Amino acid sequence: MVKESAEILSEIRKNYILSTMKGGKRIDGRLPDEFRELTIIENYIPRANGSAYVALGNTRVVAGVKIEAGEPFPDTPDQGVLTTNVELLPIAFPSFEAGPPNDLAIEVSRVVDRGIRESKMISPEKLVIEQGKKVWIVFLDINVLDYDGNLIDASTIAAVAALRNAVVPASKEGGEDFKLPVSSTPISVTMVKIGDTLVCDPSLEEDQICGGRITVTTTEDGHIRAMQKGEIGAFTVEDVKKAVKMSLEVGKKLREKYFR
């Protein structure tokens, strides 16, 4: 009976969200292309080489950067290394459990990592200490503290903010510390389909009842650097065009406000 009541309530809530969307508004009053309130605090972890705390609505994440000297990959002896990891802490959401990364954590880490790599945000050739023998390895760790939808964008923003203030501890190798070389500011914008409408920065409820999810990562030069399709549902060619347009416009607004 409890399960049946929950299913009925869920269906009622879904219909309410859909009917509200038909009026051009979302259940929290936002417009389709409007992000929730965003807070970014840089240098959040004192002992990290770079860090940032991000609150996107009630979704909260912390990104930390640790940079150490190590061996390069055999196929890229003239480049530094970036490794990205996302951990969903059990305190963040009832279904999150300690242990190996689940599918959500793996997806978020891959999308964040791909956006950073494909945008050439980090200049890997500038992280070489001795070609073929020693390079700087950038460990990017993202911890989810609270989950209320849109982990991908919250994690991307935290990662970008942390990398932008990261310092390479070159003094440990006999040199002088220097800022991590970055050349762009990739921003991911995640959109879901509610009925026939695309909305960005989905809340948890919107994510749960959506008819498909798409994430587009762009840079300030107006180029698309990465795309990711998620959840069950299909997008038309027109939907994808709208998603790209929205991601470029929203990404530009976020950069101008938070990453000048």
From Swiss-Prot:
UniProt protein name: Exosome complex component Rrp42
PANTHER family: EXOSOME COMPLEX COMPONENT RRP42 (PTHR11097:SF8), EXOSOME COMPLEX EXONUCLEASE RIBOSOMAL RNA PROCESSING PROTEIN (PTHR11097)
Assembly notes: Component of the archaeal exosome complex. Forms a hexameric ring-like arrangement composed of 3 Rrp41-Rrp42 heterodimers. The hexameric ring associates with a trimer of Rrp4 and/or Csl4 subunits.
Any GO MF annotation of the entry: mRNA 3'-UTR AU-rich region binding
GO cellular component, one term: cytoplasmic exosome (RNase complex)
Primary site of residence: cytoplasm
Entry similarity comment: Belongs to the RNase PH family. Rrp42 subfamily.
GO biological process, one term: rRNA catabolic process
This protein's UniProt keywords: Cytoplasm, Exosome
Its job: Non-catalytic component of the exosome, which is a complex involved in RNA degradation. Contributes to the structuring of the Rrp41 active site.
Pfam families: RNase_PH, RNase_PH_C
Annotated source species: Thermoplasma acidophilum (strain ATCC 25905 / DSM 1728 / JCM 9062 / NBRC 15155 / AMRC-C165)
Compartments where located: Cytoplasm
InterPro entries associated with the record: ExoRNase_PH_dom1, ExoRNase_PH_dom2, ExoRNase_PH_dom2_sf, Exosome_comp_Rrp42_subfam, PNPase/RNase_PH_dom_sf, Ribosomal_Su5_D2-typ_SF, Rrp42_archaea
SUPFAM superfamilies: Ribonuclease PH domain 2-like, Ribosomal protein S5 domain 2-like
